[in-house]
Amino acid sequence: SDEQIFHVALDMLKGTSGDFSRKAILGYNVTQYPVKIMFKDLSEINEAYATFDAIGWKKRGHLYIYINPKHEYAPPGALAALLSHEAIHQDEYNSLSEETYAWTMEAVVWTEILKKYPESNNLESALVTRENILKQLLEKGNYTNKYIKKTVYANEGYKNLPLTSPGFINQ
């Protein structure tokens, strides 16, 4: 992507639990191509995605991460946490286990980002609000996925997902 903010966000993932995601975005993934990241009206893909913050998408052998344009002015640290989540999705299959893992990764990365870049905690940003909610769930569960998992399983957007998916083995 040529959006400067995504380059900044990727740099912020260095040395965090999201480094795997950073490498996946740079091309170390199932497709062997870099992931294309862009802001996009998600309702153009599917009306059901209109309110989503972001989606990971695979199309014609390439991976994409589309981020809701409402986050265009989010701090790069919050975008970094979001990217660490979306880069987990590398195939056409999704599951509750994969989402639980991705949301937990996002919460852990956000916690790490705040330690390194406290200025990321800009409370004006809707994305920062999301990240802080995830961080609270992580802390409430004593740094396990206990409460994040409950939140994922209760999410309307995931109600038709299977428990597991072929490309994802839950640790």
What residue spans do the PLM features occupy?
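Auxiliary, metal-adjacent structural segments of Zn-dependent hydrolase domains
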Residues: 1-64, 122
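Residue-level detector of alpha-helical secondary structure
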Residues: 10, 14, 131, 135-138, ...
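Charge-dense, intrinsically disordered terminal/linker segments
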Residues: 44, 91-92, 101-106, 118, ...
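Long amphipathic alpha-helical segments with strong coiled-coil/leucine-zipper propensity
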Residues: 65-72
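Soluble non-cytosolic domains of exported or imported proteins
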Residues: 73-78, 82, 96-97
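Active-site recognition of the HExxH zinc-binding catalytic motif
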Residues: 81-93
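Post-HExxH zinc-binding segment in Zn-dependent metallohydrolases
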Residues: 94-133
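Pan-zinc metallopeptidase signature
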Residues: 139-171
